[in-house]
Swiss-Prot record:
Transmembrane portions of the chain: 37-57, 75-94, 111-133, 154-175, 224-244, 302-322, 332-352
A GO BP entry: positive regulation of MAPK cascade
Native source species: Aplysia californica (California sea hare)
Tissue specificity comment: Reproductive system.
Name of this chain's protein: 5-hydroxytryptamine receptor 1
Topology in membrane: Multi-pass membrane protein
Amino acid sequence: MKSLKSSTHDVPHPEHVVWAPPAYDEQHHLFFSHGTVLIGIVGSLIITVAVVGNVLVCLAIFTEPILSHSKSNFFIVSLAVADLLLALLVMTFALVNDMYGYWLFGETFCFIWMSADVMCETASIFSICVISYDRLKQVQKPLHYEEFMTTTRALLIIACLWICSFVLSFVPIFLEWHELSVEEIKAIFKDNKTEKEKALEAHNFSSALNQTLGDNQKSNAKHVCLFDVHFTYSVIYSFICFYVPCTLMLTNYLRLFLIAQTHQVRIRSLQMTNPPQLRGQGASSYRNQGTQGSKAARTLTIITGTFLACWLPFFIINPIAAADEHLIPLECFMVTIWLGYFNSSVNPIIYGTSNSKFRAAFKRLLRCRSVKSVVGSISPVSPAYRAFSWIRPSRLDLSSSEHPSDACDTGRGKNSKGGDCATADPTKPDVSVSEEIIYAGTKVFDSDTAFSS
């Protein structure tokens, strides 16, 4: 969503009498004549990283059994798709528009482009908010999470997320709820004609004039894709699509941090009250939970903090620019827009550096290795092996042996290794099964599963 981009109108051409604001065109041309190369390089880099990174995220989740079995990763796919569409459908045309200084793709696509911009940004924001909520539910009630977050419920949440994003973008823009009328502009700026007023007058004038122009004349006219945002529309959109989700994200992060602190208190309590022989066992479990919870909180902080750093400047400036366009320089406004776009290229990098499962999947995809070769190379004692084993129901089946070769032969009273079957005390829990049960309860605190457990 941009305060300077949605209705298409003519920019003055030296050979024709199509009237439009020369002040805007001169300022626009002057700015980009000195920075076109830099804009092209930086914009192309942001787009490339966003496309490659988000494609890798989607491929990693769809091709890795460790990642594809997680309901949480459905929401990461939603975020990656939103960022990918933003890069392909919005950033690409925004870069061309900013480099040329005028719109090349027609009036109809101007509306589609602006609507896609608002929809993808909104879907990205909502997805990050849902991810933080999903993460909190795992930490709060890990044993009930699988029952709560079913595949149907996860897909329903994603569907609602995208439907809301579509309604908040395409409907208001195509119904022109966002636009200022000439009367509203005159009431705000009184007798001083502004660039927006001239633009709207030019649009009304040129719409009638273009009907009398020849095909060659109309083909030579240059157009600008403007988004003349009503102040009320800007405030409502910013509140619903940014400030409310951000408040929820920060609340979820705070609650997750408090849970991690609670486990730290339990660790100290166990160390002080339990006897030495039990202190190590209980404290070790809580210590792992507390440490992993702190890592998960830090990862969530990085995601949320990066998002705020990228989008907060734009959502502060946008209502101000809608109220009075002269308060915000064009250059400053464009920097905040591209800073928001930059968030779409940062998210895959954060996943790749903070999650070992994503790192392994990215390496496999970049090296074109098969899934079987990666799974076969995982050590039985590695965290990745434990995570992969955790998704297999047989690992928690107490009626079956994990190692068939060690099964007890009831006829001989011996196992396959010659050991005495009687040495296994049925009253004592099996160590491997106990580890799996503990892992099932504590895996949500693992930093590697901060957003993909």
